[in-house]
């Protein structure tokens, strides 16, 4: 029997070595681009990996967030480099530092001497260079000062309650007659209707539906790779922004013309306030500033509220003991209402202590905002590591909100953990950010959520069609079926 001889071509080992060598060279490109210029200081960078040229670590980020375990992205960093709480990476087109602990996140968000807003250029192209995400610290303070009171002020919130409540009551009754429907989709329409009325006095269903569709496309592009080629989410998002800007420009131009002709409405909305406001030097906002503020507020003002309402409602229905406690609180508010008072008052919403715990726990569990972006204004030392000037810093809220040392059994929905005035340590609960860049519409958002849950708890129940439906995490945490469900009376 002839002896069988196995052989390997002489070029095969060379090809394998060549592949490994090429891989090593390619993986070093970002190191040469961003670390070499630091000289000896590069040795003080946090542990981590800058990934591939151009795409950096985005593939592993997107891969993790398209699974049922998005936290595997940072867990891999911790497993590979240890629980440092600070890691280098290349994210959204920039050399970056990811911080994952309450202490590091708090410092980054509150130290305005060391850090400034650092949103990626791709995000600013979508949200607007004159919005809160794209302007300097001084401009941010000015714009926030001019717009805060009309959004979050006591008088403004009291004025919004009747309109919010009227719409909530109407849609809840309507939904009981619709059979099966996408709960999240209709919640977003509700919250968009409310924010459109507050800002623009608009109640046109056609206009609202068209704009809301554009916002959906816009949001899918914010967390996507910045590939401006047809077929990619970012390209669709840029087209959506152009449509939104054109629509808002038309509205602003029409309102300015009405004011020139002295055609004034008895009702003042947010656009009127934006057209009227002047800073201490008498400077007003130009059209670009107004449009970017409108685009940002209308987006944040309906996306976060709609998603939070959906998850809070679902969590309440899944936890009967929590639901009963929250319902009892709302019934007590009704019993304590002064005779002759119709509808909720701001004072009553601030008595909803347990419901506020439900909302906070929902915000903690779902972590609506994945991260905030900052940029180092100078070389910064943190935890013994260097954050180089000009590098982006990402505060990773998901890790902060599931820290078991602060929140025992962190994956569990448990509003009772907030009992007895429990306040997490500074930086451990950041649903609206922190510091001077705290979300400017947070009080309005919580008011909307509380009013909806008040009426839902008193009369309604929700039954999901697919309770085991998979969850997607980009751009925001939601069921893939948009929470297909039925609403009925209790």
UniProtKB/Swiss-Prot annotation:
Top EC group: oxidoreductase
Membrane disposition: Single-pass membrane protein
This enzyme's EC code(s): 1.14.14.107
Pathway in which the depicted protein is active: Plant hormone biosynthesis; gibberellin biosynthesis
Pfam families: p450
A Gene Ontology term for the protein's cellular component: endoplasmic reticulum
Transmembrane segments: 6-26
GO biological process per UniProt: gibberellin biosynthetic process
Biological function: Catalyzes three successive oxidations of ent-kaurenoic acid giving gibberellin 12 (GA12), a key step in gibberellins (GAs) biosynthesis. GAs, which are involved many processes, including stem elongation, play a central role in plant development.
Name of the protein described by the UniProt record: Ent-kaurenoic acid oxidase 1
Encoding gene, per UniProt annotation: KAO1
């Amino acid at each position: 029997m002839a002896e069988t001889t196995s052989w390997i071509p002489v070029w095969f080992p060379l090809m394998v070595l060549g592949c490994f060598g090429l891989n090593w060279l390619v993986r070093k490109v970002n190191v040469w681009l961003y670390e070499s210029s630091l000289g000896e200081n590069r040795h003080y960078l946090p542990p981590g990996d800058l990934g591939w040229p151009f795409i950096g670590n985005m593939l592993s980020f997107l891969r993790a967030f398209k699974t049922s375990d998005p936290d595997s992205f940072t867990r891999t960093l911790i497993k590979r480099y240890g629980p440092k709480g600070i890691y280098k990476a290349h994210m959204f087109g920039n050399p970056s530092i990811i911080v994952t602990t309450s202490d590091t996140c708090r410092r980054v968000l509150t130290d305005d001497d060391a850090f400034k807003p650092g949103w990626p250029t791709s995000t600013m192209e979508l949200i607007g260079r004159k919005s809160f995400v794209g302007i300097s610290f001084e401009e941010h303070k000015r714009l926030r000062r001019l717009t805060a009171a009309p959004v979050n002020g006591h008088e403004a919130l009291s004025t919004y309650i009747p309109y919010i409540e009227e719409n909530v009551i109407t849609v809840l009754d309507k939904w009981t007659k619709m059979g099966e429907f996408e709960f999240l989709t209709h919640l977003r329409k509700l919250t968009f209707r409310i924010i459109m009325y507050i800002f623009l006095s608009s109640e046109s269903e056609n206009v609202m539906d068209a704009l809301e569709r554009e916002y959906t496309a816009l949001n899918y592009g914010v967390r996507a790779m910045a590939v401006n080629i047809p077929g990619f989410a970012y390209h669709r998002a840029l087209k959506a922004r152009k449509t939104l800007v054109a629509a808002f420009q038309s509205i602003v131009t029409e309102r300015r013309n009405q004011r020139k002709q002295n055609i004034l409405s008895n009702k003042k909305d947010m656009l009127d306030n934006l057209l009227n406001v002047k800073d201490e030097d008498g400077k007003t906002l130009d059209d670009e500033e107004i449009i970017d503020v409108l685009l940002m507020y209308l987006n944040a003002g309906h996306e976060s509220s709609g998603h939070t309402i959906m998850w809070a409602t679902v969590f309440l229905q899944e936890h009967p003991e929590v639901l009963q406690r929250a319902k009892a609180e709302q019934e007590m508010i009704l019993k304590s209402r002064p005779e002759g008072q119709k509808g909720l008052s701001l004072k009553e919403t601030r008595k909803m202590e347990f419901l506020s715990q439900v909302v906070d726990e929902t915000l903690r569990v779902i972590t609506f905002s994945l991260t905030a972006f900052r940029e180092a204004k100078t070389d910064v030392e943190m935890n013994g590591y260097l954050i180089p000037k000009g590098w982006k810093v990402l505060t990773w809220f998901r890790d902060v909100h599931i820290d078991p040392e602060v929140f025992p059994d962190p994956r569990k929905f448990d509003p009772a953990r907030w009992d007895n005035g429990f306040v997490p340590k500074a930086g451990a609960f950041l649903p609206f950010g922190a510091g001077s860049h705290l979300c400017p519409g947070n009080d309005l958002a919580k008011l909307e959520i509380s009013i909806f849950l008040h009426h839902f708890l008193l009369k309604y129940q929700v039954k999901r069609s697919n309770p085991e439906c998979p969850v997607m995490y980009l751009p925001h945490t939601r069921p893939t079926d948009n929470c297909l469900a039925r609403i009925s009376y209790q």
